[in-house]
Amino acid sequence: GNFEPVICLQLYIKIGSAWEKEDEAGFSHFMEHLTFKSTVKFPFNQIAAYISKLGGSINAYTDFDCTCYYISLPSEFVMEGLEVLAELAFHSTFTKEDVEVEKDIILEEMVQNTLDPETNFLQFVQDAAFTNYPLKRPILGTKESIKKASYKELRDFYHKYYQPHNSFLVIAGEAEF
């Protein structure tokens, strides 16, 4: 049958919970939330709708060693997908209000995680296995670190780590550039 060639774009930022300083606990995950808010070319919450209109999907995740933004879309829109990833990674315009809104969302996410037996078990194993290592830190951070996180601290974190020399791009699929 007929099918449309699809491409997957993954942009990795080399910062995750294991590389955060103690007072930055959860900042990598916080960035994952904030970068989607708005960018120079995509005002408030328009990124997902734009990718969807192109027939694609976009998401992100934070891990111990990286934060990954990924897009799957028809290959003919590879340049549009790359533009969106560049906007997220290097041109985010999140605001003080965005920080406060996302704080509440992340704190609620923490509550939901405490209700999940699998998440609790994995955190227990991490705590036991990595007693003196940064891998012990929860990806979401701590209630204290998230509550006290300021707009300036998060903005500084973004500008420090969200740099071309601290990222890499993976492209899978068929596309012409």
Q: Across the structure, where does each feature detected by a protein language model lie?
A:
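Charge-rich, well-structured scaffold segments of protease-associated domains
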Residues: F44-F177
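His/Glu-rich zincin catalytic helix
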Residues: G1-Q46, E83, R155-F177
